[in-house]
Regions:
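ATPase nucleotide-binding head domains, primarily ABC-like/P-loop NTPase cores
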Residues: 1-152
Length: 152
């Protein structure tokens, strides 16, 4: 087992294979879109879980290569499927509706965020993990600050 520094007073871990879907990319050579490449990766993960492998998954912005309604419906279905397979992991998202899954599965899902604060017209980060869904709209703040949004 690998040894890594951990910034905490105690830690309990359960050894599992780490599987990620973080840097999916498209391929003109293989005639494969970003979205299709992501679906293939998610299918590989589900297939491994169906075979009984114990995995810890880390997924970043799932289904971001499609429209928002399709993304939400597919993301909800994927999360439900992962829960049925008793999967542990982390899903990073900026989709506020996906954060509402905790209302349906309060014992299985936890929401955590890194909140950005706006102080003296500057964006600052504490880099502290907080419980809940991020409340600040830092994208609009940054766009306005850069002159990309004229009206509020």
């Amino acid at each position: 087992m690998y040894r890594l520094p951990v910034c905490c007073s105690s830690l309990e871990i359960y050894p599992a294979k780490l599987v990620t879907s973080l840097r999916t990319s498209d391929s003109l050579t293989d005639n494969e879109s970003y979205f299709f490449a992501e679906l293939k990766r998610l299918k590989q993960i589900i297939d491994r879980l169906n075979k009984g492998e114990e995995l810890f998954i880390i997924l970043d912005e799932i289904l971001k290569g499609t429209n928002s309604m399709d993304k939400q419906k597919g993301s909800f279905a994927l999360v439900r499927q992962l829960m049925e397979l008793k999967t542990n992991g982390i899903i990073a998202t900026h989709d506020l509706l996906l954060g509402k899954l905790i209302e349906y599965f309060p014992k299985e899902i936890r929401n955590y965020c890194f909140e950005a604060d706006i102080t003296n017209d500057e964006l600052t980060f504490s880099y502290k993990l907080r419980e809940g869904i991020a409340q600040n709209m830092n994208a609009c703040f940054l766009m306005k600050k850069m002159g990309l949004i004229i009206n509020d």
